[in-house]
């Protein structure tokens, strides 16, 4: 069960790579990271400016070094989730990633549920529902066509296209209603029939795009 308002953590990259990125998001994200991350030099991590990137070490409760990492700080609302957020880039060992997650949980984090970072981004207005769905589509894309569609959707292109199509339909509907009001005057024609045909064609194109993306859901 997702607990909105808590501070969550999870590995945000696929396993098996040279680098793993652990994302922490929530009201205590910066403070929790500060408890286990010691910058190599300079001020404490929690006092650094937004978007700052810091090199240092992850230290456990006994003072032992777990890994040398690079950590990035994002302050709300300018982050992926719209919350305070940090990202720890560590070596790609599953053991190291799990050790860091365990330390974060000891420091007050909860493990994120699948899709929870994107859910928070949606709830905080960082993306609309279409864009949130596109994140899953992008991850699952298996062809160039589905990848292009997901990227366009994630950038808001699909949402804008649907919104524009809705506006055109509403405008045409109002003109057709106006024609009904003046039905006694057969010579009056407000709605452009060719525009109606074009809208129908555009709707078919949108439906075909949705059909392409369905297998990735």
Task: Describe each region flagged by the PLM.
Residues 1-148, 152, 156:
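A glycine-rich (often HGG/GG-containing) alpha/beta subdomain
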Residues 126-209:
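Long, non-coiled-coil amphipathic alpha-helical linker/lever segments
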Residues 208-217:
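Residue-level detector of conserved catalytic or cofactor/ligand-binding positions
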């Amino acid at each position: 069960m997702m607990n909105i308002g808590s501070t969550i953590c999870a590995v945000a990259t696929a396993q098996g790579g040279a680098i793993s990125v652990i994302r922490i998001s929530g009201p205590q994200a910066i403070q929790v990271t500060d408890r286990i991350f010691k910058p190599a030099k300079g001020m404490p991590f929690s006092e650094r400016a937004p978007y700052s990137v810091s090199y240092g070490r992850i230290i456990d409760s006994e003072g032992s070094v777990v890994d040398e990492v690079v950590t990035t700080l994002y302050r709300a609302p300018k982050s992926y989730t719209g919350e305070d957020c940090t990202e720890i880039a560590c070596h790609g060992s599953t053991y190291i990633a799990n050790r860091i997650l365990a330390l974060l949980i000891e420091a007050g984090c909860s493990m994120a549920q699948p899709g929870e970072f994107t859910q928070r981004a949606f709830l905080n207005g960082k993306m609309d529902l279409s864009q949130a769905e596109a994140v899953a589509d992008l991850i699952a894309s298996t062809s160039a066509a589905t990848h292009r569609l997901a990227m366009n959707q994630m950038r808001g292109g699909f949402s804008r296209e649907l919104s524009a199509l809705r506006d055109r339909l509403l405008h045409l509907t109002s003109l057709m209603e106006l024609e009904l009001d003046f039905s006694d005057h057969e010579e009056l024609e407000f709605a452009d029939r060719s525009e109606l045909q074009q809208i129908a064609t555009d709707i078919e194109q949108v439906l075909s795009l949705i059909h392409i993306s369905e297998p990735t859901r």
